[in-house]
A protein has these predicted regions:
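N-terminal core-binding DNA-recognition domain of tyrosine recombinases/integrases
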Residues: 1-9, 19-33, 39-98
Length: 98
């Protein structure tokens, strides 16, 4: 995974991160279940990295989280893929960093 650029489209007065995620998902007509799953994975990602903002993280931290899920969490490939899709949505569509 290539490293992500360090200039996110987030300003100090921007709405809270998960609100931004939900708004983008609703604009694109994602199902409520997908919205819930993605926001849960994003929360878990942030908590895994001790509440660091995703804009301050990049591909290395995403890889660490996904590896942790596979090795320590022993999640299935489809579960790991769902977490990856949630993080891809966050970085590409919300933070506009990918």
């Amino acid at each position: 995974m290539p490293s992500l650029p360090a200039s996110p489209k987030v300003t100090p007065d921007a709405p809270r991160l998960l609100i931004q995620v939900r708004d983008k998902m609703r604009l694109r007509h994602y199902s409520i279940r997908t919205e819930q799953a993605y926001t849960d994975w994003i929360k878990r990602f942030v908590l895994f990295h001790r509440k660091r903002h995703p804009a301050a993280m990049g591909a290395v931290e995403v890889e660490q989280f996904l590896t942790y899920l596979a090795v320590e969490g022993k999640v299935s490939a489809s579960t790991q893929n769902q977490a990856k899709s949630a993080l891809l949505f966050l970085y590409r569509d919300v933070l506009e960093m990918a």
